[in-house]
C-alpha cells in the first residue's frame, strides 16, 4: 500500500500525507486530475481532484470553480467536502490564500460510475433515460437559478450510482457566473462545450451565448441515452453544423440570413423541412419523447425550453414535482465575478512585488480589494488568450483511455446522496462532521422510500409508480405481451383443430348417407324367388352353386347390418328421449330432434374436445418462459377456484356438478343451446347438466376440470 502511494505521489505529484490511502486514478476533469481515495479518519471513499496552479489563468479558474462548488448544494450535484492544500493542509475561507500555493485538492463525493461508461455498454431503456433526464433537468434548474453556466455538459461529467439510479452533475472546472442583468456579449470564452454537444448558436457566435447552451447539450445527451451513440458527431465545426442543419429545422428568417452569410453553400431557400428529421435518427422512441426532444433541440435558443419548462413538459409528468425542485436561495451576481478578478490581480501583484516591498506595513489581508477598474477589463476572460485552447482541454477525456487492468471504480457506494440545504461547518480543521451531516440530513423527495414523493404520486395518480423499479414494470409488460401472443396462438390452433373436426364430421355424415342409400335399396324377394326357380330348373354346376352361396351370404350380411344399425339408432333415440324428458315440455321437440340426429356427432366432438384439453394442458405446462408467467398463471387458477366458495353441507352436490363441465361437455352444451335458439333460457343449470352428463363418454368425464358453475352466464364466461 505504501509503495503504491509513493508511486502515485511521485508520478502524479499527489501529496496528501497519510490520511488518504488506496489511491486509484479515475480520470481528468476540466482542469485537473481526479483520483479516488479512502479517508482513514472516517473510513469513507472520496474523490479527490488536484488542480495545479502554475499561472494567473489557472489560479483564476481554480478560484471560480471553488467559489461555485462551495455555494451549490443540491441532490443532483456532486457534493464538495473540503479544499486542501499540499500535504493535506487545511485552507482558510479566504480564497486569496490560493495564490500562495502551487496546487490545491478538492475533496468531493465519490460516485460509482459515469454516464459515458454506462453508454459504452449500449443504449438505455426509455424509462431509464427519462429518469436520468429528469434528474439532469432538476440539477440544471438549480444551477441556472444560481446564475451559473456549466458549459461542459457531456456523459463523462454526469455521475451515477447504479444502486439507487441517482444522477449527479459534476466537474465545474469550466463553469462560470452569468448575471442575466448584465450583457456578457464579447466577453465569454470560445468553444468551452465539447464539440459534439455545442448548440448551433455557439458554433455561429462563440462569444455570445446564454444558459440555452446547457439545454442543447442536455437534449443531445438524452438522445444519446436512447440510441447509445452520439446524435451529432461531426469531425470538425463545419461538419457539425451541417449535421445539425440536416435534422433541425430553421424556422426564423433572421437565422437563415445569418447562416447564409457564414456558410452559404449549405443553405437552401426553405430550411423548415430537414432532410433527416429526428424521427429518422430516433426511430424507436415514443411520440411523447420525440415531442419533448424537438422542443429542446431547436435552432433558435429563444424557442428552446428552459430547464424549468422542460420539467413541466407532459413527458416528465411521471416524475415532476415542482415543490421538490428547488432553486438557489443565494444566486451569484456580477459582483462575485468582479471580486474574484480584482482579488487575483491584487494578490498576484503583491506576490510579484513582495521582494521589492517586503517591509510594507500592510499584511495580505489588509490589501485593498476595490479599485476603479474599467468594467470592460474586468469582464474580459483571459482564458480565450491562452496558448492551449479550452477546446483541447475539454475534448480530451482520459477516463475513457485508462488501462484495462487498472481499477476504475470501487464496488462499495461512497456516500448517501442527501445533504443539508446550507452547509454549516463548525470545525474547519476537520470534515468528519460533514459526512455525518450528509448522512443525517434531509433526503431528496423523489428518491427511493421518500414519503413526500410517494404521497404526491398517490394524490396525483391514485397509485404509486416507483421510478426505481422500471425493470419490473418492463418485465410485467413483456409478460403481458407474451401471454397475449400465446393466447392468440392457442386460439388459432384451436380453430384449425375445429376445422379438422368439421371435416371428420362431414366424412362420417357422407358414410352414413351412403349406408342409408344401400339400406334404402332393400331386398327384392320376388326377383330372388324367380332367380332361384330358374337356377333350379337348370343343371347345377359347381360355378352356379358358388354364385348362389355368395348371393346368400351377401343377403345375410346385409340383413345383419340393417338390424345392428336399427338397434343402435333405436337405443340412442330412447336414451336421448329419457334424458331430455327433464327439460320440460317447452323444449321437448326441438331438443329431441337436435339431440337424436346428432348422437354420433356428440360422441365424436366429446372425444376430440377431450384430446384438445389434454394437448392444451400439456402445452401450458411447457410454455412457461419466466417466473412471472408461472406466477400469474397460478394466480388466475386460484382466483377462478375461489369465485364460488363451497359450504360443508353442499360440498358433495357441488363437487358432482363440477364434474359435469368436461372438455366435450362445454362444447356440446354451447352447440346445443345455439342450435335450439332459446336465448331466454334462464333456468338453473343443474338439471340440464345432469342430463347431458349421461351422454358424455367416461374419458371425457375423467379429464374435465373441477370448476363449479351455477349459472348459464358463468358457463359462457368459462367457455369464452
UniProtKB/Swiss-Prot annotation:
Outcome (variant: residue 189 to E): Mimicks phosphorylation state and induces constitutive protein kinase activity
Motif interval(s): SEG motif: 189-191
A Pfam family hit: Pkinase
Active site annotation, chain numbering: 152
Gene3D superfamilies referenced in this protein's UniProt entry, alphabetically: Phosphorylase Kinase, domain 1, Transferase(Phosphotransferase) domain 1
Biased composition (Polar residues): 700-714
Enzyme class name: transferase
Compartments where found: Cytoplasm; Nucleus
Reported impact of residue 171 to A: Kinase defective mutant, abolishes activity
Basic and acidic residues bias spans: 647-657
GO molecular function, one term: ATP binding
InterPro entries: Kinase-like_dom_sf, MAP_kinase, MAPK_ERK3/4, Prot_kinase_dom, Protein_kinase_ATP_BS, Ser/Thr_kinase_AS
Family, as annotated: Belongs to the protein kinase superfamily. CMGC Ser/Thr protein kinase family. MAP kinase subfamily.
Protein's name according to its UniProt entry: Mitogen-activated protein kinase 6
Organism expressing this protein natively: Mus musculus
GN (gene name): Mapk6
Amino acid at each position: 500500500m505504501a509503495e503504491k502511494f509513493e508511486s502515485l505521489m511521485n508520478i502524479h505529484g499527489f501529496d496528501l500525507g497519510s490520511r488518504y490511502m488506496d489511491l486509484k486514478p479515475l480520470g481528468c476533469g476540466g482542469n485537473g486530475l481526479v483520483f479516488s481515495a479512502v479517508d482513514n479518519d472516517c473510513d469513507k471513499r472520496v474523490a479527490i481532484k488536484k488542480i495545479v496552479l502554475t499561472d494567473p489563468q489557472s489560479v483564476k479558474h481554480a478560484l471560480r470553480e471553488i467559489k461555485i462548488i462551495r455555494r451549490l448544494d443540491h441532490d443532483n450535484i456532486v457534493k464538495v467536502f473540503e479544499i486542501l492544500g499540499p500535504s493535506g493542509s487545511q485552507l482558510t475561507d479566504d480564497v486569496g490564500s490560493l495564490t500562495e500555493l502551487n496546487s490545491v485538492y478538492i475533496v468531493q463525493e465519490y460516485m460509482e460510475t459515469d454516464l459515458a461508461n454506462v453508454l459504452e455498454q449500449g443504449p438505455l431503456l426509455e424509462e431509464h433515460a427519462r429518469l436520468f433526464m429528469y434528474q439532469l433537468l432538476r440539477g440544471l434548474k438549480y444551477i441556472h437559478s444560481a446564475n451559473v453556466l456549466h458549459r461542459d455538459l457531456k456523459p463523462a461529467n454526469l455521475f451515477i450510482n447504479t444502486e439507487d439510479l441517482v444522477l449527479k452533475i459534476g466537474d465545474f472546472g469550466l463553469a462560470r457566473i452569468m448575471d442575466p442583468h448584465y450583457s456578457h456579449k464579447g466577453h465569454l470564452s470560445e468553444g468551452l462545450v465539447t464539440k459534439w454537444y455545442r448548440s448551433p448558436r455557439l458554433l455561429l457566435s462563440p462569444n455570445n451565448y446564454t444558459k440555452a447552451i446547457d439545454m442543447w447539450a442536455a437534449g443531445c445527451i438524452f438522445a444519446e441515452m436512447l440510441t447509445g451513440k452520439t446524435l451529432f458527431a461531426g469531425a470538425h465545426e463545419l461538419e457539425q453544423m451541417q449535421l445539425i442543419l440536416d435534422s433541425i429545422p430553421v424556422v426564423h428568417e433572421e437565422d437563415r440570413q445569418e447562416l447564409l452569410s457564414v456558410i452559404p453553400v449549405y443553405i437552401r431557400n426553405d430550411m423548415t423541412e430537414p432532410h433527416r428529421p429526428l424521427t429518422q435518427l430516433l426511430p424507436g422512441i415514443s411520440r411523447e419523447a420525440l415531442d419533448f426532444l424537438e422542443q429542446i433541440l431547436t435552432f433558435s435558443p429563444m424557442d428552446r425550453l428552459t430547464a424549468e419548462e422542460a420539467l413541466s413538459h407532459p413527458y416528465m409528468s411521471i416524475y415532476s414535482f415542482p415543490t421538490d425542485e428547488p432553486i438557489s436561495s443565494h444566486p451569484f451576481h456580477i459582483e462575485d465575478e468582479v471580486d474574484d478578478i480584482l482579488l487575483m490581480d491584487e494578490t498576484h501583484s503583491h506576490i510579484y512585488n513582495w521582494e521589492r516591498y517586503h517591509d510594507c506595513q500592510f499584511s495580505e489581508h489588509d490589501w485593498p480589494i476595490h479599485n476603479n477598474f474599467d468594467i470592460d477589463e474586468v469582464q474580459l476572460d483571459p482564458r480565450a488568450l491562452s496558448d492551449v485552447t479550452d477546446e483541447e482541454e475539454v475534448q480530451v477525456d482520459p477516463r475513457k483511455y485508462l488501462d484495462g487492468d487498472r481499477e476504475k471504480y470501487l464496488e462499495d457506494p461512497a456516500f448517501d446522496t442527501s445533504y443539508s440545504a446550507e452547509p454549516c461547518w463548525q470545525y474547519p480543521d476537520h470534515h468528519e462532521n460533514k459526512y455525518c451531516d450528509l448522512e443525517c440530513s434531509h433526503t431528496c423527495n423523489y428518491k427511493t422510500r421518500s414519503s413526500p414523493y410517494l404521497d404526491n404520486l398517490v394524490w396525483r395518480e391514485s397509485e404509486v409508480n416507483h421510478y426505481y423499479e422500471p425493470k419490473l414494470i418492463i418485465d410485467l409488460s413483456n409478460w403481458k405481451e407474451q401471454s397475449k401472443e400465446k393466447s392468440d396462438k392457442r386460439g388459432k390452433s384451436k380453430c384449425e383443430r375445429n376445422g379438422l373436426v368439421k371435416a371428420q364430421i362431414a366424412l362420417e355424415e357422407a358414410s352414413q348417407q351412403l349406408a342409408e342409400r344401400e339400406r334404402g335399396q332393400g331386398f327384392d324377394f320376388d326377383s330372388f324367388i324367380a332367380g332361384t326357380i330358374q337356377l333350379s330348373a337348370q343343371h347345377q354346376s359347381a360355378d352356379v352353386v358358388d354364385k348362389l352361396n355368395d348371393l346368400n351370404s351377401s343377403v345375410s350380411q346385409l340383413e345383419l347390418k340393417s338390424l345392428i344399425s336399427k338397434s343402435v339408432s333405436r337405443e340412442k333415440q330412447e336414451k336421448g328421449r329419457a334424458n331430455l324428458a327433464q327439460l320440460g315440455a317447452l323444449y321437448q321437440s326441438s331438443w329431441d330432434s337436435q339431440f337424436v340426429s346428432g348422437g354420433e356427432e356428440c360422441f365424436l366432438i366429446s372425444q376430440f374436445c377431450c384430446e384438445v384439453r389434454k394437448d392444451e394442458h400439456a402445452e401450458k405446462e411447457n410454455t412457461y418462459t419466466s417466473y412471472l408467467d408461472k406466477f400469474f398463471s397460478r394466480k388466475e387458477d386460484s382466483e377462478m377456484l375461489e369465485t364460488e366458495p363451497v359450504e360443508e353441507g353442499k360440498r358433495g352436490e357441488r363437487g358432482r356438478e363440477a364434474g359435469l363441465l368436461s372438455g366435450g361437455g362445454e362444447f356440446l352444451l354451447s352447440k346445443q343451446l345455439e342450435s335450439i335458439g332459446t336465448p331466454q333460457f334462464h333456468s338453473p343449470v343443474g338439471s340440464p347438466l345432469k342430463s347431458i352428463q349421461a351422454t358424455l363418454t367416461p374419458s371425457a368425464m375423467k379429464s374435465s376440470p373441477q370448476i363449479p358453475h351455477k349459472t348459464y352466464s358463468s358457463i359462457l364466461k368459462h367457455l369464452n
